[in-house]
Amino acid sequence: MSRTLASIGWVACWCTLAVLAACSTTTTITESRDTRAVSEPADPERRARVRLELAGLYFGRGQNSTALDEIKTALAAKPDMPEAHGLRGLVYASMGDARLAEESFLRALQLAPNEGNTMHSYGWFLCQERRYPEAEVQFEKALAQQQYRDGVRTLLAQGVCQARAGRWTESERTLSRSYELDPANPVTAFNLSEVLLRRGELERARFYVRRINSVPDQVTSQSLWLAARIDRRLGNFDALQDHGRQLRDRFPQSPELLLFERGRFDE
């Protein structure tokens, strides 16, 4: 599954953005601004929230060390803040420190055992670590929380994780549920199309990827490559060549174009 399910990167990004959205803020970071100069609220909880919001912004920009500094400040003000521990888990996971990431997620769940967002994040971390049965448990727990409102996101991540584990039937079922709830999401459509291709459901796979490629802003080298692989299997050679032309015109430096030109359609 080297370049198939390449959309997993899309999922990781989308999951991260969704988590950061929970840390919504009106604080703006500029290059010249020193966040230490931000006036600190007197209330410890409010002070922790401000620092956590800044941490989320820095994490979203890839400034992991600065994000960790802000999380440390937030936890100094409010040590039992589950969101701070959860975000710290995401930061450590993105840095490749699995031990500290897991410690942070577990601490967050200890403080807030019914927090679906943390279960989702921990589940995705476990999937990245190829601990698929444990990841499945966390996704199911998140979906079972009555107050959890991000089920579509979790179904998407769960479906991708099931595909990574080679559980194609379950993955199709899970991704189909996610698609039914959010049919406009191109990430879900892409992954569902990929899984259907794997299962030999070529016409159905073609349906979903065509929905993506019919919207100019959603077209990527990955979606064109997926369409090319499907149409080649179907024997639609005119469509196959059209996908190749689009790859050359729109994504001339993409790895997918190189694979196309070398005829490596089964990778």
How would you label these PLM feature ranges?
Residues 60, 94-95, 128-129, 145, ...:
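Register position in tetratricopeptide repeats
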Residues 43-77, 94:
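Alpha-helical segment of the N-proximal tetratricopeptide repeat
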Residues 43, 77, 111-112, 145-147, ...:
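Structural marker of alpha-solenoid helical repeat scaffolds
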Residues 28-39, 214-267:
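Terminal, low-structured helical/coil segments at or just beyond the last alpha-helical repeat
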Residues 53, 87, 121, 157, ...:
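Canonical tetratricopeptide repeat
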